[in-house]
UniProtKB/Swiss-Prot annotation:
It is a single-pass type II membrane protein. The lineage of its organism: Eukaryota, Metazoa, Chordata, Craniata, Vertebrata. Ca(2+) 5 binds at residues 1836, 1839, 1842. This is Otoferlin. One of its GO terms (cellular component) is clathrin-sculpted glutamate transport vesicle membrane. The gene is Otof.
Length: 1997
């Protein structure tokens, strides 16, 4: 369907001007070309076409706007014409002439004339035929090019372009609407895509520069909108074909986990152990007793050698277990799990210092179970991880802000059920031998299906399986497997596997992975994971059953499946659980339930699909398969599989469904004449067998010639094409984007001009493509078979692409020359997102397999995704390989394809494929090369629509191929010498030719043209021009014995010249280009070549361009590369500095004694002088030699330079020692400065002896001085201070070093209320470690600032790119905002904190520089003038050998190169002191041997790889330099992975003989040899001679005493004088008042220094030091000098190449022995912990919960005692006595604890040593946080004591105690109230009330008591002077507490207890009872005596 608008003319225009038209329909606009100088009438005559996906509604509107075009200002609207399309929809074609309307809707005179046509596919609109349909798409070339590319530079015939036109058109091209994936019909004249698109931009730039007054053209407003949408580089000539399967190859991985601590563990009085599990490996921490917040700091390493897929699916599980011991497995407190892939996808592949949330898998309603703080890192081979510095780490108290969760995952995760519904499977293969089946059949007559399938599902470390369906190829389950896990889960994939149940061993039939990210969306408008019901296809090994299947791994999902195995209908749903629901099952056990069956039609209506293929060429067939006939089989699912299909699917009868009538076929008359009965069309799925013919010694080909065999297959699948169509549209956008980005990268790499314009074009195309997707993707909305995922995914994709289109549009406006690289990075993100979205998780049609078969055996295969072959009439929906000739390289299946076996091409096919509905079959031949006749299987009436079984080509074209093979570089070393004898073999069609063999080189220059004559290509000529066949180039190593060795392969496409084209620029002659050579999946060099395919016209070869090149008579028939293609050469001089050779290994067991170096480049070269005795002095006598050579003008084409070292032996023999190829001379090229440029001497960096220095020429000195004042700042900023100055200006750099006195005066002025921590540290208390820890704080602060600025910048970029987008905030941004808010809250001190916790001021301590990496990486390997070249010998190893280049290194050549054009400018040689013998290497030192004192300081090691079974190591240092070998075995550190060594070693060495220092860390073993953990190597010689002065670091300040004493034997003034002398710099001139002038720079600084006695004396050292610290600002010779530092070096183990085994912190000082001797080494021995004693008096408790019920009275009471410890419960637990029977919760103790401990103040850790177990050889040192634990318990006599509550006080920062029990609240401990924090190390004595907490049943904290305690800290000396007794003992005893009498034991004094128990409680009741008793007694007596008295009374007695 399409709407076509033909805009003819616009008339009645006023005035004269440039006009442009804009035509808009459905939001997509096209612009016409600009018509210049139109007066009255504008004759556009342009056609615009909109392919439309859905029918046009009669109410839709077409809008046309006419503008006056302005090249500078915005365009001015003339008028608008809007047309409702009602009539167009009814009549198909409408011609219109009408007037326009202006802005105010008034009619104006101007009128337009146009024609509108509408093509509807269903034929409902007017009469039309196929001609209409095709013809309109292929209008004549000019119109079509105007429509799509009319405004794109380079897209029009160059004859029509003038400079002015080019300028206007290019400026306007931003608005050109590129239609995505537009391919022209083959009938039209093709557009010249290869023409360089930049050629026509020159006029634009010229004009822009005039406009902008010499500004950069891209800063001018018009130029800044210029966009290029056609390729500039020739990337298309380099097809990217990967031969070797990369998936499934095992790799080395290391998972390292540090468990630091746990907090808030739920439970009372726990003994927690942390279990760390990766896959099936488990490791445990030590047990911590009776604590809810244990501290571990234990490091675990897990090593794996598996494929990436297996690795990333492994689950990391961190569990906390309570009371685990040898007998008990312990009870699980909680666990946390995450897959390895989630960790690997994090920045730096790690989580650092994050808190894992624990939850109980057995009780999902239980909530949070605690937190574990840990570091998790996953390292693959070669990964470089930046680990944050380990030392002096502070506690991250903000748990919520540092959770172990990926970005965007909410901290509150909910429990959810994952329902995996398994419905049924189809097409299962036979999984049993048929022998028994045949016996059964013979006896019983049964023929059973030979498979017993069931489905197993793996998710998040759990697995569940369905029931087994016995003997069924089409099993029906209708079951669901239910998993319960937290949502969102931290496991990315779910594995679904069909398995065959077997008595012995169940085997996998097929595996499918469900990526949860692809079936859900976590955005604001996202959706929960959902899938299906949908079919998923499973692939694996071939279907023939064998008992031992060598490809069984493929069925397990490892590697690419080579055959269709089965398809499974499944569904997935997620339900978030309400954990408060009491009916909910709380277990997370996997359950299997019955699922509701679904109807067959729910996955879509079954449709008949038709697959057609034509084999146009089969070449490069491996010679192993050349002796038997070969056939090719094509299968789709089980259809077409004739050999082992076995359970062939039955053809389903088409079912009529309601709505079928509406789905009229897209092309009405496509297959009317085909019958519908079964069997009307038998499938032909394989080609007839044919015996191959020989091509050359390696390969064969099948002689198809003009008869091309065809295959066709009918198959039936649910019609879910819409899914594939949408995926294809996105793939097209992504392909276009990738091509564009590659083009931009190539432009940047090859330094082509204006990459920013090309990037704008790329973004423009992306924006249009996204818009196109929105209009096309929303079809077929009402289909009943659409699943929920289909609907949600579509919405999600539409939102993403709409957003991406808008971002691309806004990003396009921001692309400038200086931002190209940044924006390119953002565009790469777009590409990743598009590829992710295009991957459809719900399969429909299975992939197509092409198998090469010989003798009925499957040999090699290729797999093509069905979506790539799917036909659609909408261009964007068409599969990228549908109806196209595709080149396929067949490969061996499974593991056979790994390694050298996979390097050989098994076969190369040129194959045409088409897949579509049978109804659309009319189009299946439309893309084939024209000129064929069809051969049918049967002849007769009504069979004309039958597909052909072969095609006979009658049209063929004659061509000649010229392969210009110039040179190759960095080839694979195939011989044991480390060199090769390479030749290249070029394959094209069925021919091959070889270049000559060049001996012993890795960089051959063949300079040879290979001519392939008599090439016959079938098809239309112009089709071959657009898409020529692929050329294969293979590089081999010629062996005198045996066959040639394969070295690598590359692919190319030739530039095609048709007979009617002129052989002239810009397309011809072709340019030489580099092609990447691959050997398997590894790169193996580059080939510099060009290829052209020339059509031979009617007059034969006479029309071809002549072969003219430099004829070399010596080369005989070999033709060189012709002039015009070969590079233009210029004369260059190559100067070589020969310094020396190092570490040469033996050759053939003989030592190298008299080596020589040969240098060769482009056939010319030079030899070094001979080293007469390598052992005595390995340096050369003659330092500099040179030779002249002709090199290409284009630096990218420079040939490599070869360095070879030979050993000269007796009788004139010499043997090769090793060689090195410098593949790029670029870094050694010297460019004379352009003195005409302003500020040339600051902007140009010169190469002096290959050391780039600023060149300072004669310069006029300005009169004014620039004063740069360097005020003292925060230490953080101090390190960053740089003074950037112009080299010609004078400057005063004022450096004020803060003087002690000023500081002291300031301190004195401070009031007494100031906090003690702000005091100036006492100089005598400071040591080197103070300096070290202060420096680490600074480094961390800098890193934090750097990260913050980095994230701010990224956010800013994201904001910019998303500018103008109105939409909800993404969840990622929300979570980030929440985290920031939380951080702010935590950082801001509360009102109550006041002076207690202000922002900690830094003490004034001098610092050094801590480098988190090697010093070499900071200073360019110290190769400022002396370079090191590794000499290699031996064959290059392959990946699977695990070999590295290290093993091939046989020595090193030290020297340098300088390459420059001759002649040099005279002023260079005229410079002062120029010595012609040294050429460009002026001022280099002598290379005579020199004696040096090397002093190595080893500070500490971190994260060492465990070497012992217990997961620890006993490390010690070993140092080797020359013959000196030091092993510090005695001082090994027991059971430590983070040892602090603090050692220095002095070694006397002689350079150059002893220059490679090796520092290793070994593991001490009691028995057996010690194991190497890792080592690092340092080249001392490069450091010694470097201009960066790496001998002894320059300190920050100059001191003559104290901890910061100056280490260098030379003072700063002496160093400065020497540097000035060596660099021939004027100075230093010291002046009064602390001034020094060096060259034209003046530095100022303090002029006095204080000695040890406090005496001040004048000095120039401070100011000299300030000059040294800014030496890089000195003109011409300035460079950064190495500061005083500590470097961090990775430790590597040769047995585990590429994986770090830990890191070592050290630094090296070197002092020449002929200079003054240095002072004593610095003392960096580890700080000894200081001995302290903590005295804790427990006075009272209050409000303690009452646990016991009284036996007699039922009254609540508690028998209270208090327990406390500091180091650990086993080590120093102390209990008070028991306060019995407390009725009020009050307890009185007056009890003293004494805790002696050793404390490291710098690390805030207690140090303790103890044996790890009874079997340990020695004590292990532990560092634990200084935390005092106080607990209250209820004592029980017979049962275990009951735990009531606890508080843990961090002695460095704990809440100040409340003055009274009433003021003491629970919030003090939970941190909800701002309480002043105190440190016992500062306060020394603290007394107060503290709350004691425990968790209740709801897992919430509750107050269980209060304790009054007094803490008193004393040093060991003070404690000795004032001793006190433990408990209430002497000396200084505490008085006994005055406890109430209730607090005794009742059975010792029952009367007393009765008195207390009864009288105190019930006295009033007792009194009432007594009174009542007396009254009753009285009444009883009265009654008793009443009768007597009455009788007496009556009787009167």
């Amino acid at each position: 369907m399409a709407l076509i608008v033909h805009l003819k003319t616009v008339s009645e225009l006023r005035g004269k001007g440039d006009r442009i038209a804009k035509v808009t329909f459905r939001g997509q606009s096209f612009y016409s070309r600009v018509l210049e100088n139109c007066e009255g009438v504008a004759d556009f005559d342009e056609t615009f076409r909109w392919p439309v996906a859905s029918s046009i509604d009669r109410n839709e509107v077409l809008e046309i706007q006419i503008f006056n075009y302005s090249k500078v200002f915005s365009n001015k609207l003339i008028g608008t014409f809007c047309m409702v399309l009602q009539k167009v929809v009814e009549e198909n074609r409408v011609e219109v002439t009408d007037t326009l309307m202006d802005d105010s809707n008034a009619i104006i005179k101007t009128s337009l004339s146009m024609e509108v046509r509408y093509q509807a596919t269903d034929g409902t609109v007017g009469p039309w035929d196929d001609g209409d349909f095709l013809g309109d798409e292929s209008l004549q070339e000019e119109k079509d090019s105007q429509e799509t590319d009319g405004l794109l530079p380079g897209s029009r015939p160059s004859t029509r372009i003038s400079g002015e036109k080019s300028f206007r058109r290019a400026g306007r091209s931003v608005f050109s609407a590129m239609k995505l994936g537009k391919t022209r019909s083959h009938k039209e004249e093709p557009q010249r895509q290869d023409e360089p698109a930049v050629l026509e931009m020159e006029d634009l730039d010229h004009l822009a520069i005039q406009l902008g007054d010499g500004l950069d053209p891209d800063s001018v407003s018009l130029a800044s909108v210029t966009a290029l949408t056609s390729n500039v580089s020739n990337k298309r000539s380099k097809p990217d074909i990967k031969m070797e399967p990369s998936a499934g190859r095992p790799m080395d991985y290391q998972v390292s986990i540090t468990v630091i601590e746990a907090r808030q563990l739920v439970g009372l009085n726990m003994d927690p152990v942390v279990c760390v599990e990766v896959g099936d490996d488990k490791k445990y921490t030590s047990m911590k007793e009776s604590t809810n917040c244990p501290y571990y700091n234990e490091y675990f390493v897990f090593d794996f050698h598996v494929s990436p897929d297996v690795m990333f699916d492994k689950i990391i599980k961190i569990s906390v277990i309570h009371s685990k011991n040898l007998l008990r497995s312990g009870t699980l407190v909680g666990s946390f799990k995450m897959d390895v892939g989630t960790v690997y996808s994090q920045p730096e592949h790690q989580f650092h210092h994050k808190w894992a949330i624990l939850s109980d898998p057995d009780d999902i309603s239980a909530g949070l179970k605690g937190y574990v703080k840990c570091d998790v890192a996953v390292v693959g081979k070669g990964d470089n991880i930046k680990t944050p510095h380990k030392a002096n780490e502070t506690d991250e108290d903000d748990i919520e802000g540092n959770l172990l969760l990926p970005e965007g995952v909410p901290p509150e995760r909910q429990w959810a059920r994952f329902y995996v519904k398994i419905y049924r499977a189809e097409g299962l293969p036979r999984m049993n031998t048929s022998l028994m089946a045949n016996v059964k059949k013979a006896f019983i007559g049964e023929n059973k299906d030979l498979v017993d399938p069931y489905v197993q599902v793996f998710f998040a470390g759990q697995k569940g399986k369905t029931s087994v369906q016995k003997s069924s190829y089409e099993p029906l389950w209708n079951e669901q497997v239910v998993f319960t896990d937290l949502f969102p889960p931290l496991c990315k994939r779910m594995k679904v596997q069909i398995r065959d149940s077997d008595k012995v061993n169940d085997v996998a039939i097929g595996t499918h992975f469900i990526d949860l990210r692809k079936i859900s969306n976590d955005g604001d408008k996202g959706f929960l994971p959902t899938l299906g019901p949908a079919w998923v296809n499973m692939y694996g090994s071939t279907r023939n059953y064998t008992l031992l299947d060598e490809h069984q791994d493929l069925n397990e999902g490892l590697g690419e499946g080579v055959s269709f195995r089965a398809r499974l209908m499944l569904g997935l749903a997620v339900e978030i659980l309400d954990t408060s629901n009491p009916e909910l099952t709380s277990s997370t056990e996997v359950q299997v339930e019955q699922a509701t069956p679904v109807s067959e039609s729910c996955t879509g209506r079954m449709e008949e699909f038709f697959l057609f293929g034509a084999f146009l060429e089969a070449s490069m067939i491996d010679r192993k398969n050349g002796d038997k006939p070969i056939t090719f089989e094509v299968t789709i699912g089980n259809y077409g599989n004739e050999v082992d299909g076995m359970s062939r699917p039955l053809r389903p009868r088409p079912r009529k469904e309601p709505g079928d009538e509406e789905e009229v076929d897209l092309i009405q008359n496509s297959s009317d004449d085909e019958g519908d009965e079964a069997g009307d069309l038998a499938s032909v799925s394989s080609t007839p067998p044919m015996r191959p013919q020989i091509t050359d010694r390696n390969y064969f080909h099948l002689p198809y010639l003009e008869r091309k065999p065809c295959i066709y297959i009918k198959s039936w699948w649910p019609d879910q094409r819409r899914r594939l169509y949408n995926a294809n549209i996105m793939d097209h956008i992504a392909d276009k984007l990738e091509e564009g980005l590659n083009d931009v990268q190539e432009m940047i790499k090859t330094e082509k001009s204006y990459p920013e314009r090309r990037l704008r074009g790329v973004l423009e195309e992306l924006s249009c493509g996204c818009h196109r997707f929105l209009s096309l993707s929303d079809k077929d909305q009402g289909r009943s078979s659409r699943t929920r995922l289909d609907r949600e995914r579509l919405k999600s994709c539409m939102r993403e692409l709409e957003s991406m289109g808008q971002q691309a549009k806004s990003l396009r406006a921001q692309v400038k020359r200086h931002t190209v690289r940044d924006k390119l990075r953002l565009c790469q993100n777009f590409l990743q997102k598009l590829r992710f979205l295009a991957d459809e998780p719900q399969h429909s049609i299975p992939d197509v397999f092409i198998w090469m078969m010989s003798n009925n055996k499957r040999i090699a295969y290729a797999r093509v995704p069905s979506k790539d072959l799917l036909f659609s009439i909408v261009e964007e929906e068409l599969g990228k390989d549908c109806a196209k000739v595709k080149t396929l390289f067949l490969k061996l299946p499974g593991k056979r394809g790994f390694g050298s076996a996979g390097w050989t091409v098994q076969a190369k096919l040129e194959l045409y494929l088409w897949l579509g509905l049978s109804k659309q079959r009319k189009d299946f031949l439309c893309g084939l090369p024209c000129g064929f006749e069809e051969v049918k299987a049967a002849q007769g009436l009504g069979l004309h629509s039958f597909p052909p079984i072969s095609l006979v080509y009658t049209k063929k074209q004659a061509f000649q191929l010229r392969a210009h093979m110039y040179q190759a570089r960095s080839l694979f070393a195939a011989d044991s010498s480390g060199l090769s004898d390479p030749f290249a073999r070029v394959f094209f069609i069925n021919q091959s030719q070889c270049t000559e063999v060049l001996n012993e080189t890795l960089c051959p220059t063949w300079d040879q043209m290979l001519v392939f004559d008599n090439l016959e290509l079938y098809g239309e000529a112009h089709e071959l021009r657009d898409d020529p066949p692929i050329i294969v180039i293979e590089i081999y190593d010629q062996d005198s014995m045996g066959k040639a060795d394969f070295m690598g392969r590359t692919f190319a496409k030739p530039l095609v010249k048709m007979a009617d084209e002129a052989y002239c620029p810009p397309r011809f002659p072709p340019q030489l280009e580099y092609y990447q050579i691959y050997r398997g999946s590894a790169t193996a060099g580059d080939l510099l070549a060009a290829f052209e395919l020339l059509q031979i016209g009617p007059s034969g070869k006479a029309d071809l361009p002549p072969i003219n090149g430099p004829v070399d008579m010596d080369r005989g028939p070999i033709m060189p590369v012709p002039v015009g293609i070969r590079p233009v050469l210029s004369k260059y001089r190559v100067e070589v500095l020969f310094w020396g050779l190092r570490d040469l290994k033996r050759v053939n067991l003989a030592q190298v004694d008299r080596p020589r170096v040969d240098i060769e480049c482009a056939g010319k070269g030079v030899q070094s002088s001979l080293i007469h005795n390598y052992k005595k002095n390995p340096n050369f006598n003659t330092l500099v030699k040179w030779f002249e050579v002709d090199l290409p003008e284009n630096e990218l084409l420079h040939p490599p330079l070869n360095i070879r070292v030979v050993d000269c032996r007796a009788f004139g023999r010499y043997t090769l020692v090793g060689s090195h190829a410098v593949s790029s001379l670029r870094r050694f090229i010297y460019r004379p400065p352009d003195r005409s440029a302003p500020n040339w001497n600051t902007t140009v960096r010169l190469l002096r002896g290959c050391h780039r220095l600023r060149n300072g020429g004669p310069s006029s000195r300005p009169t004014g001085e620039v004063v740069v004042s360097m005020e003292p700042e925060e230490p953080v900023k101090k390190l960053e201070t740089m003074v950037k100055l112009d080299a010609t200006s004078d400057a005063v750099v004022k450096v004020d070093v803060a003087e002690d006195e000023k500081e002291r005066k300031k301190k004195k002025k401070k009031g007494p209320s100031e906090e003690p921590e702000e005091e100036e540290p006492d100089e005598s208390m400071l040591d080197w470690w103070s300096k070290y820890f202060a420096s680490i704080d600074t480094m961390k602060e800098q890193l934090r600032q750097h990260e913050t600025s980095g994230t701010d910048l990224e956010e800013k970029e994201e904001m910019e790119s998303a500018e103008g987008l109105k939409g909800p905030m993404k969840s990622k941004e929300k979570s980030r905002a929440a985290k920031e808010e939380k951080k702010k809250k935590n950082q801001s001190p509360g009102p109550g904190q006041g002076s207690e916790a202000p922002e900690k001021k830094k003490a004034k301590i001098d610092e050094l520089k801590v480098y988190p990496k090697e010093l070499e990486s900071e200073f360019d390997s110290f190769e400022d003038w002396l370079h090191t070249f590794n000499l290699l010998r031996g064959k290059t190893g392959d990946d699977e050998d695990g070999s590295t280049e290290e093993e091939r290194i046989v020595g090193r050549f030290k020297g340098s190169l300088c390459v420059y054009k001759v002649p040099l400018p005279e002023d260079v040689s005229r410079e002062a002191g120029y010595d012609p013998t040294y050429g460009m290497f002026q001022g280099i030192p002598s290379n005579d041997p020199i004696n040096v004192l090397v002093r190595i300081y080893v500070v500490r090691a971190t994260d060492l790889h465990p070497a012992d079974i217990n997961g620890k190591a006993d490390p010690y240092i070993a140092i080797k330099l020359g013959k000196t070998d030091i092993r510090d075995k005695e001082n090994y550190i027991s059971k430590q992975l983070n040892p602090v060594f603090g050692k220095s070693f002095d070694i006397e060495a002689s350079f150059p003989m002893e220059s490679m220092l090796t520092v290793a860390v070994y593991d001490w073993d009691l028995v057996g040899t010690d194991d190497l953990i890792g080592e690092t190597k340092i080249d001392l010689e490069n450091r010694f001679y470097s201009k960066h002065r790496a001998t002894c670091g320059i300190a920050q300040t100059y001191s003559i005493h104290g901890y910061n004493i100056w280490r260098d034997p030379m003072k700063p003034s002496q160093i400065l004088t020497r540097l000035c002398k060596e660099g021939k710099v004027d100075g230093p001139h010291f002046g009064p008042h602390g001034r020094v002038r060096v060259a034209n720079r003046v530095f100022t600084g303090p002029s006095e220094i204080e000695d040890e006695n406090g005496q001040r004396k004048p000095t120039d050292e401070h100011v000299a030091l300030s000059a040294l610290r800014h030496w890089e600002d000195i003109p011409r010779v300035g460079c950064r000098l190495v500061p005083e530092h500590v470097e961090t070096r990775p430790l590597l183990n040769p047995d585990k190449p590429g994986i770090e085994q830990g890191r070592l912190e050290l630094w090296v000082d070197m002092f020449p022995m002929d200079m003054p001797a240095p002072g004593t080494p610095l003392d960096i021995s580890p700080r000894k912990p200081k001995k302290y004693e903590l005295r804790v008096i427990v006075w009272n408790t209050d409000e303690v919960v009452l646990e016991d019920d009284d036996f007699f009275t039922g009254e609540k009471s508690s028998d209270i005692f208090v327990r406390g410890w500091l180091k650990g419960q086993q080590e120093d637990k102390q209990d008070t006595d028991v306060h019995y029977h407390s009725l009020t919760g009050e307890g009185n103790f007056n009890w003293r604890y004494l805790f002696p401990f050793d404390y490291l103040a710098a690390e805030e850790k207690i140090v303790m040593s103890k044996k790890e177990s009874m079997f340990s050889w020695d004590e292990t040192e532990y560092k634990i946080p200084a935390r005092l634990t106080l607990q209250i318990w209820d004592a029980d006599h017979f049962s275990a004591d009951d735990f009531l509550g606890a508080i843990e006080l961090d002695l460095n920062r704990f809440p100040r105690g409340a003055k009274t029990a009433k003021q003491c609240t629970m919030e003090m401990a939970t941190g909800e109230v701002d309480v002043p924090l105190v440190s016992i190390f500062k306060q020394k004595r603290v007394k107060g009330w503290w709350p004691l907490l425990a968790r209740n049943e709801n897992d919430e904290f509750e107050l269980t008591g209060k304790v009054e305690a007094e803490l008193h800290l004393l040093t060991a000396e003070e404690a000795e002077k004032n001793p006190v007794g433990l408990a209430r003992n002497e000396p200084d005893p505490l008085e006994k507490p005055n406890r109430p009498d209730t607090s005794f034991i009742w059975f010792l004094n029952p009367l007393k207890s009765a008195r207390y128990f009864l009288w105190h409680t019930y006295r009033w009741l007792l009194l009432k009872f007594l009174l009542l008793f007396l009254l009753l007694l009285l009444f009883a007596l009265f009654l008793y005596s009443l009768p007597g008295y009455l009788a007496k009374k009556i009787l009167g007695a």
